[in-house]
Amino acid sequence: WEGLYAYTRSVHLSDKPLERINPRQGTPEPSDPGIDRTPKLFIGGKQTRADSGYSYPIFSRDGKQMGLVGQGNRKDIRNAVEAANSARSWAKSTAHLRAQILYYLGENLSIRADEFARRISEMTGQDSKESKEEVKLSIERLFTYAGWADKYDGAVHGAPIRGVALAMKEPVGTIGIICPDALPLLGLISLIAPALSMGNTCVVVPSEPFPLSATDLYQVFETSDLPSGVVNLVTARHGEVIESLSGHMDLDAVWYFGSSGLSATVEKLS
């Protein structure tokens, strides 16, 4: 927690526990066998099929199918961690470059702000005003952490010998992130932006009931000069991948926002 708060610079924290949001139910629509619309994950800078070959539908509040997302599994998590570890040169990039890319992400997201807001409203049932505010805050978070990229500076301390001690803040490394169910776009952006700002790479499992905001971000990542492997998104049922992610020995940290039951699992395995 100390490391997470240092990154996000949280000021006002709620004591209210997060509650699980169950995925909405509906009637799946038949697919067109003549068109390949296989849902993809985002690993290593590319849209890739889930290893399982399976997908699951996402429904709106009124039971209408909005789309399909790939059902990631343990192998997809492993591939995503490998891709993130292969992109550790991100930590050696200049703070100015990281800031530029975060600004670029914010600018590209702002171009599609109305589209993202409509998608969030349809998925979650929020009214248009709330969804537009969520997108607006997401863009502001990207700009905020772009500004912080060159301000995670070190400090000079006195030493009991003739000389000084220079303390430098360094990236944690590869961070596994399991996003909260609510606020599907803002929750994801609020977690990856500070991690990227400091030079970390990420393996992200987005909101389980509302993952389409994350899959819509694939194109934003692809057009924002983000190096391959820096952000990897694996859509999945949280309960099916949480052990694989939090227990992975090649991760340096795990950030989890969700139910207290799964929180205990994450803490035990990590």
Q: What positions do the PLM features span?
A:
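Glycine-rich loop-to-alpha-helix module at the N-terminal edge of alpha/beta enzyme cores
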Residues: G63-Y152
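A generic structural motif
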Residues: A50, Y54-S55, G70-N73, P209
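N-terminal glycine-rich, Lys/His-bearing helix-loop that initiates the first secondary-structure elements
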Residues: H12-Q65
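Conserved NAD(P)+-binding/catalytic subdomain of aldehyde/semialdehyde dehydrogenases
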Residues: W1-G3, K169-I178, S224-S270
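Short beta->alpha linker loops
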Residues: G72, M123, E133-L137, E208-L212, ...
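Conserved small-residue-rich beta-alpha loop and adjacent elements
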Residues: G147, K151-P227
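C-terminal segments
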Residues: W1-G34, K129, K136, E140-A155, ...
